[in-house]
Amino acid sequence: NMLLEYISECSNNGYQVFSHNQAPDGNFVSPTLIELNSIDEINEEKFGPILHVIKYKTDELEQILTALKNKQYGLTMGVHSRIESKADDIINKSIAGNTYINRDIVGAVVGSQPFGGTGLSGTGFKAGGPNYLLQFVDERSITKNTVAFGGNAEILNLED
């Protein structure tokens, strides 16, 4: 399993890995927390119960947000803050398709809350959103010059 290999690789490379009772056959991946030293140490999304944690100083937040944006992955972002203006600032600098503030980042229900990513995480169209079906349509415009047919309504409506 790719996720179990990734978790093992992180542990072998000296990262702090917190996990509980991984199944030996790879059919289940326990929720896992991996503490990274820098945002530069993660280069792709991990679709599984893995939470990466990066400690940073307050004055480094702008650099972190810029680095996240440059990764070009934008599925989901979670922000926990008691300072609403700080949360708003983070949201405005994010490219995430869905952002959750002071709550968990799971539980989007298609039909209730549009869900989808941007950049390398998706097309930007939201499953369950009002414009979702448009991505499957090829829009065409056809214009006929009826005067070229003589403008006669009877001739225009003739069947073969």
Set out the residue ranges of the language-model regions.
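Short beta-strand to alpha-helix junction loop
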Residues: 1-4
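Conserved C-terminal structural/oligomerization subdomain of aldehyde/semialdehyde dehydrogenase
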Residues: 7-8, 12, 24-160
